[in-house]
Amino acid sequence: MATDVQLADYPLMSPKAELKLEKKSGRKPRSPRDSGPQKELVIPGIVDFERIRRALRTPKPQTPGTYCFGRLSHHSFFSRHHPHPQHVTHIQDLTGKPVCVVRDFPAPLPESTVFSGCQMGIPTISVPIGDPQSNRNPQLSSEAWKKELKELASRVAFLTKEDELKKKEKEQKEEPLREQGAKYSAETGRLIPASTRAVGRRRSHQGQQSQSSSRHEGVQAFLLQDQELLVLELLCRILETDLLSAIQFWLLYAPPKEKDLALGLLQTAVAQLLPQPLVSIPTEKLLSQLPEVHEPPQEKQEPPCSQSPKKTKISPFTKSEKPEYIGEAQVLQMHSSQNTEKKTSKPRAES
């Protein structure tokens, strides 16, 4: 009985079964998936961005069944023999032969690597950075380009004033020197010293200059009232454009050398537009132009006089036609035959 109990407690087993039990009881080998580093515990409330980036960069293992039909393989054979027109193109050289050009741009990042602003907790911008529309139509601040235009107009006006001052200085230098010595005036019967005469001339000259300058200043103020608009219009002609945006862009971003060239052109244009003094045409020139107007009718009358000068000569009076002097007046008596003809013609006309 004791032996039966012992057998029931310890049943008989074959050697194969024992080996299987040993295998089962042993530690299982790790699979390739389990070979990676074990996940660490994550404390709530703390975000480790480096760990997220590593997880996103590591490619997930894909089984062959996940590939869709028509997807290109990344095998070296297919990548080598498949055409890539976006990377390799041919352009023509000067002789017309095709030349291979490689556009080696970095590969675009997958969508999974792009972090959204909501995930990172960063405030997002609605307008994309590097918007092509912003490059085509740049938003120029109105105050900036207006300030540049005002500065350019002030420089043009300053240069024109400098030129006028230089001209006046030259005119003053060209004036004749003071006459030395005193002169006798027949009106007063006294000697006038040279200093007083020079002062009188200066005052008269200054009075004329002040009158002319006041006239010119009034005209210039009227013309330069819209000075900025005038400069803007001249810039349109210089740059050969009608677009206000192009002129605004030029005012803000043009190099200084180009602005200096444009300033010289603006200066010459404004100097031509300014009015000339009223005394610019001398009186001699006007007098010389007056006979030229009356010359054509005189030329028409001259040819008959030149052709028959003898006909115009006065024939000598006959004895019967000699005038009689009554005081200072000359009286010429006509023939009696002529008087009778006149008398007969009068009653005929009356009838």
From Swiss-Prot:
Q: Does Cytoplasm count among this protein's keywords?
A: yes
Q: What does this protein do?
A: May play a role in spermatid differentiation. Modulates thymic stromal cell proliferation and thymus function.
Kindly state which keywords UniProt assigns to this record, in alphabetical order. Cytoplasm, Developmental protein, Differentiation, Spermatogenesis
Protein name, entry field: Protein TBATA
In terms of Pfam families, this protein maps to:
SPATIAL
Q: Does the UniProt entry include the keyword Protease? A: no
Residues in the signal sequence: none
Q: Which residues cross the membrane?
A: none
Comp. bias regions, Basic and acidic residues = 167-181, 292-302, 340-351
Q: Where is it localised?
A: Cytoplasm, Cytosol
Which InterPro entries does its entry note? TBATA-like (IPR037394)
One GO cellular component this record assigns the protein to is: cytosol
Naturally occurring in which organism (per UniProt) = Homo sapiens
What family does this chain come from, according to its entry? Belongs to the TBATA family.
Q: Where is this region: Disordered?
A: 16-40, 167-186, 195-216, 292-351
Q: Which GO terms describe its biological process?
A: cell differentiation; spermatogenesis
